[in-house]
UniProtKB/Swiss-Prot annotation:
Chain residue ranges for the region called Disordered: 1495-1521, 1632-1679
Composition bias, Basic and acidic residues: 1662-1671
Taxonomic path: Eukaryota, Fungi, Dikarya, Ascomycota, Saccharomycotina
Sequence motif: Bipartite nuclear localization signal 3, positions: 1433-1449
Assembly behavior: Component of the nuclear complex (NPC). NPC constitutes the exclusive means of nucleocytoplasmic transport. NPCs allow the passive diffusion of ions and small molecules and the active, nuclear transport receptor-mediated bidirectional transport of macromolecules such as proteins, RNAs, ribonucleoparticles (RNPs), and ribosomal subunits across the nuclear envelope. Due to its 8-fold rotational symmetry, all subunits are present with 8 copies or multiples thereof. Interacts with NUP60 and NIC96, which tether it to the nuclear pore complex.
Species: Saccharomyces cerevisiae (strain ATCC 204508 / S288c)
Gene3D superfamilies assigned to the protein according to its UniProt record, in alphabetical order: 1.10.287.1490
Gene encoding the protein: MLP2
Subcellular location: Nucleus; Cytoplasm, Cytoskeleton, Microtubule organizing center, Spindle pole body; Nucleus, Nuclear pore complex
Entry function: Together with the closely related MLP1, involved in the structural and functional organization of perinuclear chromatin. MLP1/MLP2 associate with the nuclear pore complex and form filamentous structures along the nuclear periphery. Has a role in the localization of Esc1 to nucleolar regions. Together with MLP1, mediates tethering of the some telomeres to the nuclear periphery, probably mediated by YKU70/YKU80 (HDF1/HDF2) heterodimer and show perinuclear location dependent silencing. MLP1 and MLP2 are involved in telomere length regulation but not silencing or telomere anchoring.
The name this protein goes by in its record: Protein MLP2
Source organism superkingdom: Eukaryota
Entry coiled-coil feature ranges: 32-176, 233-466, 516-1064, 1099-1491
């Protein structure tokens, strides 16, 4: 056992000596299980191979069937073609015959015509004769001539009769030919029907085959899908395998590194080992008598040393784990990159393959798509250009901001660089410290390992010393170290080992590996074994790698070949298509040429040209057809090749799938085995880890007990030294103790006796079980033999049944053939009858013709009687009459004969038809009966199949029974193991008995309990045996029922056989009666033929002779059939005899075995399921093999059981010997205790010395560890500080970057919104301008036409304009709602709208009042004032731009100087100063230009007013909606005034409010900016068409995100708008000027800082820039 374990684990034999026996036993079990699993794997592989072979055989059979069906189809087609050719030939032959007959008829008709001409001549002659009655002389001549003519007439009549007879004969021939033709047609119809039936059959066969093929294809597709799924699963497994292999490689590398480090450490500490060897020598000399104390102290020191692990191991482990994770992540990244590369390569390959064969249509579609894409790309390019231009403009405006951002980023980069440098320095220091720590830890670990190894060596030495002492003491006391019993047992073992039959290889292995003289030799052999195993493993891996490579190469080659073939086929196809297209184009071009040339050519040359063209077309068509034929042939060939290729590919795929499935199974098995090995290893490690702890615990317990005993001994010695007088009192106590000990020994012996009794009972149970198992096996073998015998009987019966069936089939075929022949004869008779009827009709027609001719002749004779003498005519006429009467009589007699024949034939036909009908009915009834019987038999077959399935279902039960036996054997093994454990426990009990009675009693109770468990197990086994017997009885009952069914089916079959025989006898009787009737009919026909000797009768006679011949042939056939029947009956009798014999044998076999009658039920199913029988045979063979294997296993198990029993007996002997030795040792202990006292003092001295040395070393190590800990803690603290600093810097940098990103995002969003608003406003402007232009044109036309138009028209126009105004108002409201951003803005809007409505109402009223006054006044000074306004506006704008630029620069400088918190008072002062300055400037400019600004409301002045309104730099954003509304009203009022032909001066002074915005710090100074304008204007949209001011536009009620401080608290907006709009009308001179002033609002932030005051909606005052000195902004900048 130990040898096997050491061989399996590749471990030296000595290392297993320290392991306990139960552990070894478990290991041995696991190894046995592993070997069994390997055997099962091999069996499974064999089964898989067998299944594969069966599958391939089935596929080959299916292919053969397909090939046979295709061959049958081809043969049927060939037969069809042959029959068609024969038909065509017969048709042509009959046509020729018909043509010949037609020619003969034509000749006969011409002869008839000649006869008629002669008759006419005769008639004319008679007429001439009647005319020349007076000429007697001539009469004589005429008489002579008449006689001559009569003779000629007679001759001609004879000729006519001959012609008629010829014609009749020809007609008969014709009729016969027609009949033959009809027969041929009928035969043709029959053949066609057969062909149609055959074609139907072929169609059905094709349908079935196609369905079968479809099913096969579906299966193929399923298999392909399964293959794909398996392939994907294999890929997944391969990837996992790769990952695992990588991890394994990494682990191997780590192991190698560890081994290298270990070797280095060994080399380093080899010197120290040499130093400590001296110490070991001293210990060996001193520790001869102190082995127990040494072992205890060594264990204690080992424990102390094991507790001295450093605290830094956790940190190092974490670092190692992180490194491993890093490596794993890198490997995963590389793997993913490789996968991505592979996928891209595959996609490129697919793209290249798909882009190989583009067609012309695809190219055209691609060109169209590319054109569209080009157009889209151009549009996108233009859009991008426009966007780029806009972006460049925006960049020009935002250059200062970008510069500031760059500076900030540079500063941040500098800070980041500093922080990274700091980090690098910190990381370098950290790495250095880590390296130092790792080196120190390695040193500490090395020291600990050395200490541990030294301790182990010390322990080993102590044990060796102990063994030496024991051996020396044994040698001193006795001559040999072993007892005689031990020597005898050793000899037995050696003899038994020699008895085993070994192979040559095994003998060599035992010689080289098992037998050894020294431990060194054993170690050397183990090393050799390891090297051999590693070499073999490397060879195996290399072989597997080569196999994988070769397989991959083969697969790649096949795939490449398939791809090349497909590409070639596609190229050929494409070439053919191009050729066809070229030919089609040529044909079309020729047709077009023909059509064009036909129109141009002349009428004479048209025909010739057409002919030439037609020839060309025909030639081209012929070429086309030939090319098509060639192409079709090529295509067919290619298709065939493709099909062949596909088939081969399918075959390859199937083989590949099978291989891959097998591969997958093998891999799964490998994985399972690996898992099992890992599990075993884990269990081994657990057990190994458990063993030292267990040993340690036992040693501690023993040490404690020893220490206690020592203490007691000391105390006793002390008491003995003090109290020698009390020894007498202790003597009785000693005697009592001895008595107790004797009692314990007796109890022990009793227990041993009971154990032996239990073992004997157990052995008896085993023997019973083995005998029962042997009986069962014998029964199984007998059953198998019966099965084989019955199968052979079955096969013989099947053959007999097949022969009977073949006979029956031949009889049925013969009956069908006879029926077909009779039917054919009936048809031929019917055709003959029809022919005869036609001949009778012809004869009747001829008789009628003759009657007519007789009448004519009578008439002629009467006429002649009148003219000629009666004497001359009477004799001739009488002769003729007599001849005619004779002919008539003959004709009548013939007719009567024919009628009699027809009647007799009709009667015979009717009788035959009746008989045929009866026979058909009988046959139909029989067929129906047979069908019913067939259905019944099929049902019986299905039932029998079900029973067969049940029997087959019983087979796995038998297998389960066998498995159950195996399980029981395993249970027995487990029980044996338990018994061994029991024995071990009993040994422990024997040792504990010496110490304490109580322990012995408890162990005795536990053994009793375990004995109870054994008895329970025995009871369970008996129950299992009873269950098996019950199952056997069940199977027997099922077999009995199956046998009864077989008997029933046999009875049915006998009854059916009797019915068939009766039917055969009745059929034979019917055929004999028919034969008698046929003979009677033939005799009748012969009588009629004797009476009538015509040609027709001769034909009939020939027909009947043919029929007789056929009758004779049929009779001969009948006789042969009877002979065959007799032969079949004999066979049947022999079969019945054999069946009776078989039944007798069956009854005997039933009596003997009663289990093998079920299989006889398969005698009907074998014709259809021969293949299944073969499969069953194979399965049975496999089962027999498995049974044999199981029996062999059982035998092996029994052998092992016997071995174990022998081992148990040997162990029991050993137990007895050990007990004896224990008793000897107990005596020796007393001697050793006295020696112990002497050794104690020496040992204590040595231990003190060692302790002192070890204490010094320990103190040094502890000091070093504390120093290292201090360093580590300081380094960790420094690391933590640096990490905190770095995290802070990171956070600051990230916050700043996030803030800048948010600002940029906000700016971009605002820009996009403003652009959208700008686009909308521009669209509205264009729309309104278009409306204005339309209105102007309408007004001009109206001025020319409607000077004398009344005011009613003006009112209508006014209404329409008012409606338009209302619509525009609604649009304004929509626009306002869209631009509404906050609640404050909405309130402002509401106020503005109310004020706007009020102003509009007031102005409309004023306008209506002043309209009448201003109608008669003219508009003279328009141009002058417009020019002055434009020049003033431009100058003022330039000045304002210069001032704003200067102030922006000043504001930037002030901002650079002052970035700290400004107060609110300072902001208010700045706002008030700015307001005052703007108001003063506005007043000055108004005063300067007050005298010159008096002009009328026209287009130019309106536009100037608009521009001034919108170009005013200090106008607030909140006022703009009202300005827009005013502008729209103004535009709508202009055409009203022009309609009324206003020629007076109208002037309006617009005083618009100034609104200050608290957010943007914009001072509204529109009143200062606006000059006194004589027109009524409310302003312009947000931006003019010239400027793009939306780029810098900001909503005044939304805080700009460039200076938002997220940390600072939000301030409230105190908006106090005060709007005051005043209007004044000046007629000639402006006298009153209004100044609008607005209160300023508190502003917290400024939005954008653009350079142009026109483009921006905010003020560009430098004082306002100082608002950036807010505390919130300052805090943000500092952060």
């Amino acid at each position: 056992m130990e040898d096997k374990i050491s061989e399996f684990l590749n471990v030296p034999f000595e290392s297993l000596q320290g392991v306990t026996y139960p552990v070894l036993r478990k290991l041995y079990k696991k190894i046995a299980k592993f070997e069994r699993s390997e055997e099962e794997v091999t069996k499974l592989n064999v089964l898989v191979d067998e299944i594969k072979s069966q599958y391939y055989s089935r596929i080959s059979k299916l292919k053969q069937l397909l090939d046979e069906s295709s061959e049958q189809k081809n043969t049927a087609k060939e037969e069809l073609n042959g029959l068609k050719d024969q038909l065509n030939e017969e048709r042509s032959r009959y046509r020729r015959e018909i043509d010949a007959l037609k020619k003969q008829l034509h000749v006969s008709h011409e002869a008839m015509r000649e006869v008629n001409d002669e008759k006419r001549v005769k008639e004319e002659y008679d007429i001439w004769q009647s005319r020349d009655q007076g000429n007697d002389s001539l009469n004589d001549d005429l008489n002579k001539e008449n006689k001559l003519l009569r003779r000629k007439l007679m001759e001609m009549e004879n000729i006519l009769q001959r012609c008629k007879s010829n014609a009749i004969s020809l007609q008969l021939k014709y009729d016969t030919s027609v009949q033959e033709k009809e027969l041929m047609l009928q035969s043709k119809k029959l053949i066609e029907e057969k062909l149609s039936s055959f074609s139907k059959k072929t169609l059905t066969e094709e349908v079935t085959k196609s369905s079968h093929v479809e099913n096969l294809e579906e299966k193929l597709y399923q298999m392909q899908s399964n293959y794909e799924s398996v392939f994907t699963y294999n890929k997944f497994l391969l990837n996992q395998n790769k990952q695992l292999s990588q991890s394994v490689e990494e682990k191997v590398l780590e192991m190698k590194n560890l081994k290298d480090t270990a070797s280095v450490e060994k080399a380093e500490f080899s010197k120290e080992m040499t130093l400590q060897k001296n110490m070991n020598d001293l210990l060996r000399s001193q520790l001869t008598s102190l082995e127990k104390d040494c072992s205890l102290r060594a264990i204690e020191k080992n424990d102390d040393n094991s507790c001295r692990n450093p605290e830094h191991t956790d940190v190092i482990d974490e670092l190692i784990d992180t490194k491993l994770r890093l490596e794993k992540s890198k490997n995963e990244c590389q793997r993913l990159q490789n996968i991505v590369m592979d996928c891209t390569k595959e996609e490129e390959a697919t793209m290249t393959t798909s882009a190989v064969s583009p067609t012309v249509g695809k190219l055209f579609s691609d060109i169209k798509v590319l054109k569209r894409q080009l157009i889209k790309e151009r549009n996108q390019k233009f859009q991008l250009q426009n966007q780029l231009e806009d972006f460049i403009l925006e960049l020009e405006h935002k250059t200062p901001e970008l510069i500031s951002f760059k500076e900030r980023t540079k500063s941040l980069e500098h800070e980041l660089k500093r922080s990274t440098e700091l980090l690098e320095t910190v990381s370098l220091t950290k790495r250095k410290q880590e390296r130092e720590i790792t080196s120190l830890r390695q040193k500490i670990n090395g020291c600990e390992a050395n200490i541990h190894s030294l301790v182990k060596q010390r322990l080993d030495l102590a044990r060796q010393v102990k063994l030496l002492l024991l051996n020396t003491s044994a040698i001193q006391e006795t001559a040999s170290p072993l007892s005689q019993d031990e020597l005898i047992s050793l000899r037995k073992i050696l003899e038994s080992s020699n008895i085993v039959n070994e192979n040559d290889s095994q003998a060599i292995i035992t010689e080289r590996l098992v037998e050894f003289s020294n431990v060194n030799e054993l170690q050397e052999k183990n090393v050799e074994l390891l090297n051999c195993i590693r070499i073999l493993a490397d060879k195996l891996e290399n072989y597997e790698g080569k196999q994988d490579k070769t397989l991959q190469k083969v697969e790649n080659q096949t795939i490449k070949e398939a791809k090349d073939a497909i590409i070639e086929l596609e190229n050929i196809n494409a070439k053919m298509e191009t050729r066809i297209n070229i030919l089609l184009r040529e044909r079309d071009s020729y047709k077009l040429l023909a059509s064009t040339e036909e129109n141009k050519a002349n009428t004479n040359s048209v025909t010739s040209m057409e002919a030439a063209r037609e020839k060309k077309i025909r030639e081209l068509e012929a070429e086309l057809s030939s090319t098509k034929v060639e192409n079709s042939a090529i295509i067919q060939n290619l298709r065939k090749e493709l099909l062949i290729y596909k088939k081969s590919q399918c075959k390859k795929k199937t083989t590949l799938e099978d291989f891959e499935n097998f591969k997958g199974l093998a891999k799964e098995k490998e994985r399972m085995l690996e898992e099992a090995i890992d599990h075993l290893k884990a269990e081994l490690e657990k057990q190994k880890s458990w063993v030292p702890s267990y040993i340690h615990v036992e040693k501690e317990r023993a040490s404690t007990e020893l220490s206690q005993s020592r203490i007691k001994i000391k105390s006793l010695e002390y008491e003995i030294s003090k109290l020698k007088k009390e020894t007498a009192s202790f003597i009785p106590t000693k005697e009592s103790l001895t008595r107790d000990f004797e009692q314990c020994c007796k109890e022990k012996k009793e227990l041993q006796m009971r154990l032996k009794e239990s073992e004997i009972s157990h052995n008896e149970n085993k023997m019973d079980f083995s005998s029962k198992e042997g009986q069962y096996k014998a029964k199984i073998k007998e059953l198998e033999n019966n099965l084989e015998r019955l199968r052979s009987d079955l096969q013989s019966k099947i053959q007999e049944i097949e022969s009977i069936r073949s006979c029956k089939d031949s009889q049925l075929k013969w009956a069908q053939n006879t029926i077909d022949d009779t039917e054919m004869k009936m048809k031929s008779l019917l055709t003959e009858l029809s022919n005869k009827e036609t001949t009778i009709e012809k004869l009747s027609s001829e008789i009628e013709n003759l009657d007519k001719e007789l009448r004519k002749t009578k008439f002629q004779y009467k006429f002649l009687d009148q003219n000629s003498d009666a004497s001359t005519l009477e004799p001739t006429l009488r002769k003729e009459l007599e001849q005619i009467q004779v002919q008539l009589k003959d004709a009548n007699s013939q007719i009567q004969a024919y009628e009699e024949i027809i009647s007799s034939n009709e009667n015979a036909l009717i009788e035959l038809k009746n008989e045929l009908a009866k026979t058909k009915e009988n046959y139909d009834a029989k067929i129906e009966l047979e069908k019913k019987e067939k259905w019944a038999r099929e049902e019986d077959l299905s039932r029998l199949r079900g029973e067969l399935g049940e029997i087959r279902a019983l087979q796995p039960k038998l297998k389960e029974g066998a498995l159950h036996f195996v399980q029981q054997s395993e249970k027995l093994r487990n029980e044996v193991e338990r018994i061994q454990k029991m024995i071990e426990k009993i040994e422990k009990m024997s040792t504990i008995v010496q110490l304490c009675k109580k322990k012995e009693m408890s162990q005795y109770q536990s053994t009793m309990k375990e004995n109870k468990d054994l008895s329970e197990l025995v009871i369970r086994l008996e129950k299992d045996a009873a269950d098996c017997q019950a199952e056997l009885t069940k199977t027997k009952s099922s077999l009995y029922s199956a046998q009864d069914l077989l008997d029933k089916h046999e009875r049915k079959w006998m009854e059916e056989k009797a019915d068939y025989e009766r039917e055969l006898i009745s059929n034979i009787e019917q055929t004999e009666s028919l034969r008698v009737e046929n003979s009677v009919l033939i005799e009748k026909v012969d009588d009629t033929a004797a009476n009538n000797g015509d040609k027709d009768h001769l034909k009939l006679v020939s027909l009947f002779s043919n029929l007789r011949h056929e009758r004779n042939s049929l009779e001969t056939k009948l006789t042969t059939c009877k002979r065959e029947l007799a032969f079949v009956k004999q066979k049947n009798d022999s079969l019945e005899k054999t069946i009776n014999d078989l039944q007798r044998t069956q009854t005997l076999s039933e009596k003997e075995y009663q289990c093998s009658a079920v299989i006889i039920d398969e005698f009907k199913d074998i014709t259809k399921e021969v293949t299944q029988v073969n499969i069953l045979k194979e399965n049975n063979a496999i089962l027999q093999k498995s049974l044999k294997n199981v029996t062999e296993k059982n035998r092996e198990i029994y052998k092992q059981l016997n071995d174990r029993q022998e081992e148990i007996s040997r162990l029991q002997r050993d137990l007895i010997q050990t007990k004896e030795q224990v008793s000897i040792n107990s005596n020796k202990i007393l001697v050793y205790e006295s020696e112990m006292e002497q050794c104690k003092q020496r040992y204590q001295d040595l231990s003190q010395q060692q302790k002192d040395a070890q204490k010094k070393d320990i103190e040094k190590l502890t000091n070093e560890i504390s120093d290292l800990k201090g360093k580590l803690s300081s380094a960790e603290n420094a690391n933590a500080d640096l990490e905190n600093k770095f995290n802070r810097l990171k956070k600051q940098a990230h916050e700043k970057l996030d803030a800048s990103k948010k600002q940029q995002a906000a700016l971009t969003n605002e820009l996009n919104e403003l652009k959208a608003i700008k686009d909308k406003l521009e669209q509205d402007l264009h729309f309104e301008n278009a409306k204005v232009i339309d209105l102007d044109t309408k007004l001009k036309a109206h001025e020319l036409q409607s000077e004398d138009v009344s005011r009613d028209h003006e009112k209508d126009t006014y209404r329409t304009l008012m409606e338009e105004i209302e619509s525009l108002k609604k649009e304004l409201q929509i626009f306002k709602t869209a631009n509404s951003s906050s609640d404050a803005f909405e309130k402002l809007k509401v106020n503005m709208e109310k004020e706007k409505d009020r102003i509009i109402d007031e102005r409309t009223k004023e306008f209506e009042k002043k309209l009448q006054e201003t109608l008669n006044k003219s508009t003279s000074s328009e141009a002058e004032y417009s020019k002055d306004i434009e020049t003033l506006k431009k100058e003022w704008l330039k000045e304002y731009e210069d001032e704003t630029l200067r102030r922006i620069k000043e504001a930037e400088e002030n901002l650079k100087k002052r970035i700290r918190l400004p107060s609110e008072e300072r902001i208010q002062k700045i706002i008030s100063k700015r307001k005052e300055e703007l108001e003063e400037e506005f007043r000055k400019k108004l005063k300067e230009n007050a005298g010159s600004l008096t002009f009328l409301d026209n287009k130019g002045s309106g536009e100037d007013a608009e521009e001034e309104l919108w170009n005013s730099p200090s106008k607030g954003n909140s006022e703009r909606p009202s300005a827009v509304a005013g502008f729209i009203n103004q535009k709508n009022l202009k055409p009203q005034e022009q309609l009324k032909n206003v020629k007076n001066d109208v002037s309006f002074n617009d005083s618009q409010s100034m609104v200050t915005n608290k957010e943007n710090n914009i001072v509204d100074s529109s009143a200062a900016g606006n000059k006194a304008i004589p027109t009524f204007s409310f302003g312009k949209p947000f931006f003019s068409s010239n400027t793009s001011s939306l780029q810098s536009f900001q909503n005044p009620f939304t805080a700009s995100q460039s200076n938002i401080n997220t940390n600072a608290p939000l301030r409230t907006l105190n908006i106090q708008p005060e709007v005051a709009v005043k209007a004044a009308i000046n007629f000639s001179n402006v006298t009153d000027l209004t100044n609008n002033s607005t209160d300023g609002a508190k502003i917290t932030e400024i939005g954008s800082t653009s350079k142009r005051p026109i483009e921006s909606g905010t003020s560009s005052d430098p004082d306002t820039k100082k608002v950036k000195e807010s505390p919130a902004n300052d805090q943000a900048s500092n952060e």
